[in-house]
Amino acid sequence: MHKYKVVYVSKTGFTKQYAEYIASALNVKAELYKKGTNTKEYSKVIFCSFVFGGNISELADIKNEVDDDKLFVLATGIYPPSPQRLSLLAKDNRLDESRLYYVSGGLDFSKLNFIKKAMLKMVRSTLEKKSDRGADDNEALRRLTQGGCFVDLNSSNPLIKDVLDER
């Protein structure tokens, strides 16, 4: 019998939505991740967090607490999901691609501090100046400009299936 734990890091609430959806499917409760969270007694730990500057927030901490073969990671971001985005994120965060799931999150400017807003403004400016923008870049630029919720809870179903299928 597997014991599952779902933990999340969320600043604006979008990642929390995914964590609660996944936890509900696994019949457990999603918990806000805090460094030092007890994960030893669980056979599978699902870590949900957001991407900022190419890094999955607090991933290094959870990786120090959970064995790689027990850890599944769901990352939310402003870019639309794609195989290329997943590969890049896995490489940049030193994760096995088969344990990483990337989904669209959201952007609520009212919940961000000055520093995060300034950083996002720089990202937006860089994208605006990019001469060879592709469709994903254009969509990310639109999302960075307008903000909003881009959550699609069903996009986390492959993670749920993989967690349940892994025996």
What are the language-model segments listed below?
Residues 1-67, 161-166:
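N-terminal beta1-alpha1-beta2 submodule of the flavodoxin-like/Rossmannoid cofactor-binding fold
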Residues 119-167:
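Glycine-rich phosphate/pyrophosphate-binding loop and the adjoining helix
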Residues 34-115:
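Helix-loop-strand module that forms the ligand-binding subsite of alpha/beta enzymes
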Residues 3, 39-40, 77, 133-136, ...:
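Residue-level signal for well-ordered alpha-helical segments
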Residues 19, 23-25, 30, 60, ...:
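A sequence-composition feature that detects small, non-aromatic residues
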